């Protein structure tokens, strides 16, 4: 339970029972924060990871009344809840907009009304689309599907709430996140999780296309640390001229590997399936900005982790 005297910072995490959110909750607790966890368990994950040392709220981020009640005395908000995978968003673009645009605006408004110190928004590298790589934050958006378009719209709402209302926001564009608790089946499973499940079941790894697609993989523990540093770093605001609040920061490894390389590191029992529309060929982050302004660098390499 949350102490009424609140001797520690209080953070609210949406999507807190999922893959990235639950790892972030663990990290915040390690840093001495109290945590309010919000999740509606709609992601069709293998498992949900509610933490017994937090105050847990089962609710939808589009429900303003329920969300507003969860914001009492909150210092920091980490907004991860989303329609977060490509194929579900392509099949149901209205649902993606409701969750990723309306839900994000509800959270921003609740944060504004509660007077939180800073709001950290989890976004996606897919907003870069077919821009030249490595992707840098100054590139224009090139959204190829409803998922990336709706997440990029959420970024614009964050910037607007900073400029218009003075709410401190930071946008983190994740590249391909991997690590413990990654989903291994269903629409929300990333490629490494799918490959690991297939290997454990004695099945061939299903490689989309020819496996030449390149991905920038970043470990979930590095992502959790990036969130914490983005929320607490004083480096983002010095004065009205040197102000980086409301801006986008890449969270990636700064390197990339082909899907074929990842598959080979897991199992040589492989098969190939047709390419899917709306997917990018390469994700590759330039992480100069987040290193310079927040002091974050990744620590875990995907091929080392897979050994």
Predicted regions and their residues:
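Short, solvent-exposed loop/helix junctions and linker helices
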Residues: 14, 98-101, 147, 185, ...
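Gly/Ser/Thr-rich beta-alpha loop segments that engage phosphate groups in nucleotides
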Residues: 17-20, 61, 105, 131, ...
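NAD(P)-dependent short-chain dehydrogenase/reductase
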Residues: 133, 156-215, 220-232, 264-267
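C-terminal substrate-binding subdomain of Rossmann-fold SDR/epimerase-dehydratase oxidoreductases
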Residues: 200-307
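Residue-level signature of the cytosolic catalytic core of signaling kinases
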Residues: 50, 59, 184-188, 244, ...
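N-terminal Rossmann-like NAD(P)+-binding domain of SDR-like oxidoreductases, especially those catalyzing
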Residues: 1-177, 221, 231, 296
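Activation loop
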Residues: 85, 124-127, 131, 187, ...
């Amino acid at each position: 339970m949350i102490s009424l005297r609140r001797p520690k910072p209080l953070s609210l995490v949406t999507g807190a029972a999922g893959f990235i959110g639950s790892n972030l909750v663990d990290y915040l607790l390690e840093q001495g924060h109290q945590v309010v966890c919000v999740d509606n368990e709609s992601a069709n994950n293998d498992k949900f990871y509610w933490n017994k040392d937090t105050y847990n709220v089962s609710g939808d981020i589009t429900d303003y009344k329920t969300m507003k009640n969860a914001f009492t005395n909150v210092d920091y908000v980490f907004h991860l809840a989303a329609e977060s995978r490509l194929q579900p968003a392509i099949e149901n673009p209205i649902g993606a907009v409701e969750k990723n645009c309306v839900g994000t605006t509800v959270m921003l408004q609740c944060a504004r009304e509660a007077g939180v110190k800073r709001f950290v928004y989890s976004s996606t590298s897919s907003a870069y689309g077919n821009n030249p790589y490595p992707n840098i934050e100054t590139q224009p958006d090139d959204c190829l599907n409803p998922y990336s378009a709706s997440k990029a719209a959420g970024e614009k709402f964050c910037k607007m709430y900073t400029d218009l209302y003075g709410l401190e926001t930071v946008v983190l564009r994740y590249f391909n996140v991997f690590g413990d608790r990654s989903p291994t089946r269903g629409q929300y499973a990333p490629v490494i999780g799918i490959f690991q499940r297939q290997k454990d079941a004695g099945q061939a790894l299903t490689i989309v296309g020819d496996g030449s697609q390149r991905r920038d993989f970043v470990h979930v523990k590095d992502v959790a640390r990036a969130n914490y540093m983005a929320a607490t770093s004083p480096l983002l605001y010095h004065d009205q001229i040197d102000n980086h609040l409301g801006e986008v920061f890449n969270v990636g490894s700064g390197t990339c590997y082909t899907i074929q390389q990842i598959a080979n590191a897991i199992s040589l029992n492989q098969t190939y399936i047709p390419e899917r529309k709306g997917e990018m060929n390469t994700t590759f982050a330039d992480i100069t900005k987040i290193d310079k302004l927040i002091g974050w660098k990744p620590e875990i390499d995907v091929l080392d982790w897979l050994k």
